[in-house]
């Protein structure tokens, strides 16, 4: 999308890791999001994608596997939310890679302000993945097999406190499922502009994505605020907790 070209880093996080699927994204240069859990067959699939698509200039690593793939293929490296960068020591471990990073979404802004390294990205917008499931909940609930799969889209899980979570499928060499908080983290209108922002647009429509990016671009440029549509079930996450 044209509006995405205004961002510093564009990350593609496909539901299906397949060269043909990724080829449909009309973007000249981007980072590939690397899942946090990979078996050898998954690594082989991602290696094939990294080799075939020259538009991939970097990887967003959510585990050590992503870091090593960046090194093997000489790609730029972004330490994503899955790396849980919690303090300056965590950042220092990777200084030789010259990489960018996302601050842990378990940190408050007070804790982030204590970092000596101020160049990280604050997770400012989007639904947070709480867990990756290697087993198949569809097989368990629907009593089906892979060759007679009964997956027909996202399913909803409710815990004992009646909190709702989406279960979304991600396919690499096999199916994985992500447990996603339905309360969208949203800091727009509350956070100051002197930061780098990580915006997770997954699950948004093209129009919602455009308005979200435009709003944050307006915020950092000091222009007129372009209000994001008010959404239900938003949260501040840990960002405004009074801990330090």
Role assignments for model-derived ranges:
Residues 1-244:
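Active-site pocket-lining/capping segments in soluble small-molecule metabolic enzymes
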């Amino acid at each position: 999308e044209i509006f995405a070209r205004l961002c510093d880093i564009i990350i593609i996080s496909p539901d299906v890791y397949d060269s043909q699927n990724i080829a449909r994204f009309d973007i000249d240069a981007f980072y590939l999001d690397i899942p946090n859990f990979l078996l050898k067959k998954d690594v082989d699939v991602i290696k094939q994608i990294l080799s075939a698509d020259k538009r991939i200039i970097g990887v967003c690593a959510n585990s050590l596997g992503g870091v090593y793939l960046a090194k093997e293929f000489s790609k730029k490296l972004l330490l994503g939310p899955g790396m849980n960068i919690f303090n300056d020591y965590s950042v220092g471990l990777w200084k030789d890679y010259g990489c960018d990073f996302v601050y842990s979404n378990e940190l408050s802004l007070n804790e982030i302000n204590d970092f000596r390294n101020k160049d990280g990205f604050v997770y400012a917008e989007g639904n947070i993945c709480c867990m990756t499931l290697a087993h198949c909940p569809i097989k368990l609930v629907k009593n089906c097999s892979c060759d007679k799969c009964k997956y027909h889209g996202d399913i909803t899980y409710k815990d004992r406190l009646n909190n709702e979570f989406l279960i979304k499928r991600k396919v690499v060499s096999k199916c994985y499922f992500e447990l996603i908080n339905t309360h969208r983290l949203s800091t727009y209108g509350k956070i100051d502009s002197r930061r780098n922002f990580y915006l997770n647009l997954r699950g948004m429509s093209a129009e919602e994505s455009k308005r979200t990016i435009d709003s944050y671009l307006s915020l950092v440029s000091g222009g007129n605020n372009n209000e994001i549509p008010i959404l239900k079930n938003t949260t501040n996450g840990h960002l405004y907790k009074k801990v330090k």
